[in-house]
């Protein structure tokens, strides 16, 4: 991934359950708060230090899971700011499609008000 200012990217509010793992077989739950194409803001009750790289898994569409590695870049109470540090082509396409659908849904909601 290219180095860039993550705040310059559009963040899409999302509420979706996911799971994190530190590489062992134990997964623990998390909740996506928002995301961009290069990072995800997550809520978790686990204390995870900045710099740690975790496996992430989330079902974006029925039987279609995003699986990638996230690096913790900042921690604020129960929220973890992460950047995607490893993702395959399938995951990139799935993430892009999911973000496009979420963004379109948010735009439709604003137009209806």
Q: What are these model-derived regions, one by one?
A:
Residues 1-35, 100-113:
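N-terminal helix initiation/capping motif
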Residues 9, 43-48:
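Short, surface-exposed secondary-structure edge patches
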Residues 16-22, 52-65:
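Short conserved beta-strand and strand-loop elements enriched in small hydrophobics
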Residues 23, 37-38, 75-80:
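Short, conserved beta-turn/loop elements at beta-strand boundaries and strand-helix junctions
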Residues 29-31, 67-73:
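Short beta-strand-centered aromatic/proline hotspots
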Residues 34, 72-76, 86:
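A residue-level detector for short acidic-glycine micro-motifs
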Residues 44, 58, 70, 84-86:
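Residue-level recognition of conserved beta-strand positions in structured domain cores
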Residues 80-113:
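C-terminal output/interaction extensions
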């Amino acid at each position: 991934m290219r180095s860039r200012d993550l705040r310059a990217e559009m963040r899409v509010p999302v509420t979706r359950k996911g799971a994190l793992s530190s590489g062992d077989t134990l997964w623990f739950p998390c909740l996506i708060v928002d995301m961009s194409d290069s990072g995800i803001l997550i809520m978790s009750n686990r204390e995870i230090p900045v710099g740690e790289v975790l496996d992430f898994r989330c079902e974006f569409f029925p039987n279609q899971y995003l699986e990638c590695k996230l690096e913790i870049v900042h921690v604020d109470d129960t929220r973890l700011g992460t950047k995607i540090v490893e993702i395959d082509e399938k995951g990139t396409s799935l993430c892009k499609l999911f973000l496009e659908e979420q963004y379109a849904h948010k735009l439709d909601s604003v137009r209806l008000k």
